[in-house]
């Protein structure tokens, strides 16, 4: 059985004033409030979502 790698991301900029699709991506990653941290599986799908909103988040 293999262990799944995880990635931690933190919301460092408010999504107010951004595109609706970017706000939906932030919610899809499990981020709600500013400086909230979410730990997710490191998959190509999650990496793509992080890349889309890279100006809003920081990878820890």
Swiss-Prot record:
UniProt keywords, alphabetically: Ribonucleoprotein, Ribosomal protein
Gene Ontology CC: cytosolic large ribosomal subunit
HAMAP family found in the cross-reference section: Ribosomal_uL30_B (MF_01371_B)
Similarity comment: Belongs to the universal ribosomal protein uL30 family.
Domain of life where this protein originates: Bacteria
An individual GO BP term: translation
Gene: rpmD
Protein's name according to its UniProt entry: Large ribosomal subunit protein uL30
Organism encoding this protein: Acidovorax ebreus (strain TPSY)
A molecular function (GO) term: structural constituent of ribosome
CDD domains: Ribosomal_L30
Subunit structure and binding partners: Part of the 50S ribosomal subunit.
